[in-house]
Amino acid sequence: MEQALSIVVLAAGKGTRMRSRYPKLLHPVGGRPMLDHVLRTAFSLEPEAVHVVHGHGAEAVQAAHADWPVRWVVQEPQLGTGHAVEQAIPAIPDDHQVLVLYGDVPLVRPETLQALLAEADGGLGLLSVDFPDPTGYGRVLRDGHGAVTGVVEHKDATAAQRRVTECNTGLLAAPAGRLKAWLQRLDNDNAQAEYYLTDVIAMAVADGVRVAAYPVADPAEVQGVNDRVQLAAAERVWQRRQAEDWMRAGVTILDPDRFDLRGHFAAGEDCRIDVGVVLEGRVELGAGVEIGPHCVLRDVALGDGTRVEAHSVLDGATAGRNCRIGPFARLRPGTDLADGAKVGNFVETKAARIGPGSKVNHLSYMGDAELGRDVNVGAGTITCNYDGHSKHRTEIGDGAFIGSGTQLVAPVRVGRGATIGAGSTVTRDAPDEALTVARSAQRSIHGWRRPGQRPDRGEGSDA
């Protein structure tokens, strides 16, 4: 019978090296808090329970993860990793296997942890890694036959022990009953005056319990995050992983080192993503979608064959099939482009529906607007949707043509097939199939001089 699993996540550290007012574990990797990554991995192993030991910033950490069905355990004071596990262990049945994870080690894969649990096999298992520069890490000690005899922390290691490059990651699996007994025997007679969880390894050896060290293949999986330099390194590892996964799924990413996914992503085959693209929130791309360089997409859904040109920002927008967006376009929340619609360079939209085949090509603002089918909006056209108190809508019928430099003062309706003369300020509804021109008559004032060219005061007087 497979042994039941309980997971303990250590998340009580202060994170002083982050130099931040926020708890370390709330700093994001891939758009999600570090601890969120660890919890997702933990629950993927289908444990009986997950216990999170927290301390510094406890209320903020718990509030940010309120949707997770975890047991929160406060460690106060914080006296080391062994002391932290001791706070959670009483609630775990003796016949469970315990897996200890760390909230600031966000990149470990579920497959690695499954291998560690299998390697432990009723004994004690620890995850080890070979670091070319092991400074700061606890060293795994072995006897002449290669059997694990213990772990010594860097500060407590001798010169000979510091030359060992096999390091302890801190991730550990052990039988709950035995772990409880070992934790009761811990002392803090060490350089940091803390209760080290790693001391249970020597206890296991002394008690004749098999100790297995499972070496992780990719050191990046177990890289801890203690400062912002390490946070940035973890971010790039995470992003590279996501990029490679999507490339294997049929998405072309021109440079996986310049790709940022910070939320949920779904894409059809043959999508193409250029350099410097940032995807946030929930982004869904149909087949054959192309995203140009240095675009930001946040909570966006794009239909098959749609193309977004360089330096465009899309937020809370949707587009149908074969749309063209940008370059330098900004689509704000509530924007919906029907099939074949086009929003061109330096165009901003907000709460606007652009109908099938309609075009807003240049230097325009469409806010709180409804455009029908095959509408053409000339350069420099804006909807004046806000009167200082309320927002008002503009409706433009199928096939309408709006001349350049037009102001549509909402609420207003432009009829089907209507034409608006360039430079008009439209304040009343424009009828179907009619030309509407709303601008003052042109006049020329002869002899007019600019202010700097006007004669001095008193020039030509008899005084």
From Swiss-Prot:
<feature type="binding site">
    <location>
        <position position="168"/>
    </location>
    <ligand>
        <name>UDP-N-acetyl-alpha-D-glucosamine</name>
    </ligand>
</feature>
<feature type="region of interest" description="Disordered">
    <location>
        <begin position="437"/>
        <end position="463"/>
    </location>
</feature>
<feature type="binding site">
    <location>
        <begin position="10"/>
        <end position="13"/>
    </location>
    <ligand>
        <name>UDP-N-acetyl-alpha-D-glucosamine</name>
    </ligand>
</feature>
<feature type="binding site">
    <location>
        <begin position="80"/>
        <end position="81"/>
    </location>
    <ligand>
        <name>UDP-N-acetyl-alpha-D-glucosamine</name>
    </ligand>
</feature>
<keyword id="KW-0012">Acyltransferase</keyword>
<feature type="binding site">
    <location>
        <position position="404"/>
    </location>
    <ligand>
        <name>acetyl-CoA</name>
    </ligand>
</feature>
<dbReference type="GO" id="GO:0016020">
    <property type="term" value="C:membrane"/>
</dbReference>
<feature type="binding site">
    <location>
        <position position="379"/>
    </location>
    <ligand>
        <name>acetyl-CoA</name>
    </ligand>
</feature>
<keyword id="KW-0808">Transferase</keyword>
<protein>
    <recommendedName>
        <fullName>Bifunctional protein GlmU</fullName>
        <ecNumber>2.7.7.23</ecNumber>
        <ecNumber>2.3.1.157</ecNumber>
    </recommendedName>
</protein>
<keyword id="KW-0961">Cell wall biogenesis/degradation</keyword>
<dbReference type="GO" id="GO:0006048">
    <property type="term" value="P:UDP-N-acetylglucosamine biosynthetic process"/>
</dbReference>
<feature type="region of interest" description="Pyrophosphorylase">
    <location>
        <begin position="1"/>
        <end position="228"/>
    </location>
</feature>
<dbReference type="GO" id="GO:0000287">
    <property type="term" value="F:magnesium ion binding"/>
</dbReference>
<keyword id="KW-0677">Repeat</keyword>
<dbReference type="GO" id="GO:0071555">
    <property type="term" value="P:cell wall organization"/>
</dbReference>
<dbReference type="GO" id="GO:0009252">
    <property type="term" value="P:peptidoglycan biosynthetic process"/>
</dbReference>
<feature type="binding site">
    <location>
        <position position="350"/>
    </location>
    <ligand>
        <name>UDP-N-acetyl-alpha-D-glucosamine</name>
    </ligand>
</feature>
<feature type="compositionally biased region" description="Basic and acidic residues">
    <location>
        <begin position="453"/>
        <end position="463"/>
    </location>
</feature>
<dbReference type="InterPro" id="IPR001451">
    <property type="entry name" value="Hexapep"/>
</dbReference>
<feature type="binding site">
    <location>
        <position position="376"/>
    </location>
    <ligand>
        <name>UDP-N-acetyl-alpha-D-glucosamine</name>
    </ligand>
</feature>
<dbReference type="InterPro" id="IPR025877">
    <property type="entry name" value="MobA-like_NTP_Trfase"/>
</dbReference>
<keyword id="KW-0573">Peptidoglycan synthesis</keyword>
<dbReference type="GO" id="GO:0008360">
    <property type="term" value="P:regulation of cell shape"/>
</dbReference>
<dbReference type="InterPro" id="IPR005882">
    <property type="entry name" value="Bifunctional_GlmU"/>
</dbReference>
<keyword id="KW-0133">Cell shape</keyword>
<keyword id="KW-0548">Nucleotidyltransferase</keyword>
<feature type="binding site">
    <location>
        <position position="439"/>
    </location>
    <ligand>
        <name>acetyl-CoA</name>
    </ligand>
</feature>
<dbReference type="GO" id="GO:0019134">
    <property type="term" value="F:glucosamine-1-phosphate N-acetyltransferase activity"/>
</dbReference>
<feature type="binding site">
    <location>
        <position position="153"/>
    </location>
    <ligand>
        <name>UDP-N-acetyl-alpha-D-glucosamine</name>
    </ligand>
</feature>
<comment type="pathway">
    <text>Nucleotide-sugar biosynthesis; UDP-N-acetyl-alpha-D-glucosamine biosynthesis; UDP-N-acetyl-alpha-D-glucosamine from N-acetyl-alpha-D-glucosamine 1-phosphate: step 1/1.</text>
</comment>
<keyword id="KW-0963">Cytoplasm</keyword>
<feature type="active site" description="Proton acceptor">
    <location>
        <position position="362"/>
    </location>
</feature>
<feature type="binding site">
    <location>
        <position position="226"/>
    </location>
    <ligand>
        <name>UDP-N-acetyl-alpha-D-glucosamine</name>
    </ligand>
</feature>
<feature type="binding site">
    <location>
        <begin position="385"/>
        <end position="386"/>
    </location>
    <ligand>
        <name>acetyl-CoA</name>
    </ligand>
</feature>
<feature type="binding site">
    <location>
        <position position="422"/>
    </location>
    <ligand>
        <name>acetyl-CoA</name>
    </ligand>
</feature>
<comment type="similarity">
    <text>In the C-terminal section; belongs to the transferase hexapeptide repeat family.</text>
</comment>
<dbReference type="GO" id="GO:0000902">
    <property type="term" value="P:cell morphogenesis"/>
</dbReference>
<feature type="region of interest" description="N-acetyltransferase">
    <location>
        <begin position="250"/>
        <end position="463"/>
    </location>
</feature>
<keyword id="KW-0511">Multifunctional enzyme</keyword>
<feature type="binding site">
    <location>
        <position position="332"/>
    </location>
    <ligand>
        <name>UDP-N-acetyl-alpha-D-glucosamine</name>
    </ligand>
</feature>
<feature type="binding site">
    <location>
        <position position="104"/>
    </location>
    <ligand>
        <name>Mg(2+)</name>
    </ligand>
</feature>
